[in-house]
């Protein structure tokens, strides 16, 4: 029987153990997409307690707690921090088989150094007190944890109207060497069907000093904000494409669509598709000219529980996987961006694992001469960010493309403790390749495969995003 979560966790062949310990383990972290609050990094935030750093804002944990029958006041409500932690500790033993069980104990190991102890009601007091004592130390501040985890770069997620003042503050601090760069997330300027669109256009117009009436005005406003982001080191965009749409329109049609929406009219689905297509094609060209990477996160079905949405708002654990087709529209969109050779480097993520092969084959249609891995099939996202999901994504990428050119893992997280997801990914990667070697499906060449692992863990992302590190 194999003990739980030793130093060789998941490494079930000798070759996998060598790959991980000699090549993967000590690679730095290039976390190119996350949702960490830049203000906390700028202020070097000190966490009040284990709840503050670990459970606050974590919709993965809330979903599990709700499934375990925990009252909402202990998830998002007015219960005390300790009450919420105790509710989580009581839920953890029920999460065996869920990635939360592995994540929880990896996060207790690093950075807290807690090994050989499982979180449960019987250990909750000891773990709460031990972690809180450590969180009071300087090296467990926001920056301290990032430095402990050997992070070299993080890309936060930022709205076009953001001032980016916290990124500027971080960049001016010569004592902190980790790159913290903004990522452009223009969903609110894109989702014309949303009730908040008109208010957002007013805010965008104000910060860009542009009166947005026609589509060209919107382009002007977005260009000014792109310049603002570029001045703060941005090299990455991110789009939530819950549904991929494609429909072309001329300038007069786009002007009419925008004007009628600003006047309060409801648009048809075709008109929404026309507007979204035009925005994505315009932005894609801007990204290409600037050498940016665009990311498309495709296929979320959001805010399913209307009663809870009205009570709690979005992003609190009531989203799931959509099953709408996307291949044809995505193909047309990428082809349109490519017509003028202005398709930027692109990472495609799908939430429905049914679509893995769709994306795995789609990227092969639009690769770029002289640019290894220009089009990427992104790592297992959200509900696929678990052992089977990551194995499926990497196996299918290997079968349909080049795994060796993969830009690897990202946390996509709001928590400073989530860097162990890179460790989890690396262990799974080494396990998978080790099994290939054991079965005679890959050569037992430690130098060849070791370099491949190092590249997937760090080097490929560093080179792909072309961000100069400190």
UniProtKB/Swiss-Prot annotation:
Domain of life: Bacteria
UniProt KW Isomerase keyword: yes
Species annotation: Escherichia fergusonii (strain ATCC 35469 / DSM 13698 / CCUG 18766 / IAM 14443 / JCM 21226 / LMG 7866 / NBRC 102419 / NCTC 12128 / CDC 0568-73)
Name the record gives this protein: Uronate isomerase
Gene Ontology annotations of biological process type: D-galacturonate catabolic process; D-glucuronate catabolic process
Gene that this sequence comes from: uxaC
Keywords carried by this UniProt record: Isomerase
Molecular functions per Gene Ontology: glucuronate isomerase activity
UniProt similarity note: Belongs to the metallo-dependent hydrolases superfamily. Uronate isomerase family.
EC number(s) on file: 5.3.1.12
UniProt-listed NCBIfam families: PRK02925.1 (NF002794)
Reactions this protein catalyses: D-glucuronate = D-fructuronate; aldehydo-D-galacturonate = keto-D-tagaturonate
UniProt pathway annotation: Carbohydrate metabolism; pentose and glucuronate interconversion
InterPro entries, per database record: Metal_Hydrolase, Uronate_isomerase
């Amino acid at each position: 029987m194999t003990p739980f979560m030793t130093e060789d966790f998941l490494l079930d062949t000798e070759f996998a153990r060598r790959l991980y310990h000699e090549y993967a383990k000590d690679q730095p972290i290039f976390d190119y997409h996350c949702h960490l609050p830049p203000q906390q990094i700028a202020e070097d935030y000190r966490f009040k307690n284990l709840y503050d750093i670990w459970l606050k804002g974590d919709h993965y944990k809330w979903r599990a707690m709700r499934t375990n029958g925990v009252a909402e006041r202990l998830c998002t409500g007015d219960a005390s921090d300790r009450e919420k932690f105790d509710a989580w500790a009581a839920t953890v033993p029920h999460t065996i088989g869920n990635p939360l069980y592995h994540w929880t104990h990896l996060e207790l190991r690093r950075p807290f150094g807690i090994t050989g102890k499982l979180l449960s009601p019987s250990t909750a007091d000891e773990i709460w007190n031990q972690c809180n004592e450590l969180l009071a130390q300087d090296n467990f501040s926001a920056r301290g944890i990032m430095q402990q985890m050997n992070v070299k770069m993080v890309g936060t997620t930022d709205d076009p109207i953001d001032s980016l003042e916290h990124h500027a503050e971080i960049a001016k601090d010569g004592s902190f060497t980790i790159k913290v760069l903004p990522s452009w997330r223009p969903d609110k300027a894109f989702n014309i069907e949303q009730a908040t669109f008109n208010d957002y256009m007013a805010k965008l117009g104000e910060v860009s000093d542009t009166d947005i009436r026609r589509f060209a005005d919107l382009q002007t406003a977005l260009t000014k904000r792109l310049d603002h982001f570029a001045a703060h080191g941005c090299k990455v965009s991110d789009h939530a494409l819950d549904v991929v749409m494609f429909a072309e329109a001329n300038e007069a049609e786009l002007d009419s669509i925008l004007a009628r929406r600003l006047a309060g009219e409801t648009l048809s689905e075709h008109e929404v598709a026309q507007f979204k297509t035009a925005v994505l094609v315009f932005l894609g060209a801007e990204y290409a000219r600037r050498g940016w990477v665009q990311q498309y996160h495709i296929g979320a079905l959001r805010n399913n529980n209307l009663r809870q949405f009205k009570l709690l708002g979005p992003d609190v654990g009531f989203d799931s996987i959509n099953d709408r087709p996307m291949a044809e529209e995505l193909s047309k969109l990428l082809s349109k961006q490519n017509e003028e050779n202005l398709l930027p480097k692109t990472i495609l993520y799908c939430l429905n694992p049914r679509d893995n092969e769709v994306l795995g084959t789609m990227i092969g249609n639009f690769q770029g001469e002289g640019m290894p891995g220009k089009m990427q099939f992104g790592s297992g996202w959200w509900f696929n960010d678990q052992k089977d999901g990551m194995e499926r994504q990497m196996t299918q990428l290997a079968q349909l493309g080049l795994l060796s050119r993969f830009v690897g893992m990202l946390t996509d997280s709001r928590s400073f403790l989530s860097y162990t997801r890179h460790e989890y990914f690396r262990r799974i990667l080494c396990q998978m390749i080790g099994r290939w070697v054991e079965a005679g499906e890959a050569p037992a060449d430690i130098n060849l495969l070791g370099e491949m692992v190092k590249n997937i863990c760090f080097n490929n992302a560093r080179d792909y995003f072309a961000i100069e590190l400190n």
